[in-house]
């Protein structure tokens, strides 16, 4: 598992490149539908990634990076008591990560990229989308949001639980 937030962010965004081609070029159906699904997937993911980039920069500014620490992005350093002194910005920073992870998860209401993408993706690509990519969003919520922003995460946990349940039920009923 990536224990460095910057490395995680790079890999988080790097996943888009092969999946774009797997969906857009090698999916099934007509080329226009494949291209539309691939572009929709990339735009959603890039929007989430851009929001998360603001969070990564904020973690650097308000965290150990402000003191010039070499390991400013290491999760163990970020989760140490008092490592992130963001004050009122802590909630905003946590939301930046949460939005990006909710898009990847895909959680209602930012899940609309998945049906069109899964519809044109081949079996192996769908396995990557559902078996790997979706889990990265959930993993990020648990391993990054909760430890770095424990107080802020506790405040939004009931909302996340409701959205997760709605996502599960919506997915089951729409399938």
Identify the meaning behind each predicted range:
Residues 1-8, 18-175:
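Hydrophobic transmembrane alpha-helices and their helix-loop junctions in integral membrane proteins
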Residues 13:
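Short phosphate-coordinating micro-motif centered on Lys-Gly-acidic
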């Amino acid at each position: 598992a990536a224990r460095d937030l910057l490395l995680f962010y790079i890999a988080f965004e790097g996943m888009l490149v092969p999946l774009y081609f797997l969906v857009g070029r090698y999916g099934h159906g007509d080329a226009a539908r494949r291209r539309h699904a691939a572009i929709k997937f990339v735009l959603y993911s890039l929007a989430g990634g851009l929001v998360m980039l603001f969070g990564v920069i904020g973690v650097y500014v308000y965290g150990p990076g402000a003191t010039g620490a070499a390991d400013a992005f290491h999760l163990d350093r970020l989760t140490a008591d008092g490592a992130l002194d963001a004050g009122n910005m802590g909630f905003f920073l946590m939301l930046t990560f949460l939005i990006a992870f909710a898009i990847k998860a895909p959680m209602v209401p930012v899940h609309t990229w998945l049906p069109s993408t899964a519809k044109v993706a081949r079996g192996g690509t769908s396995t990557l989308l559902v078996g790997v990519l979706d889990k990265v969003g959930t993993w990020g919520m648990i391993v990054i949001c909760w430890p770095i922003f424990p107080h802020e995460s506790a405040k939004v946990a009931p909302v996340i639980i409701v959205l997760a349940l709605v996502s599960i039920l919506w997915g089951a009923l729409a399938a």
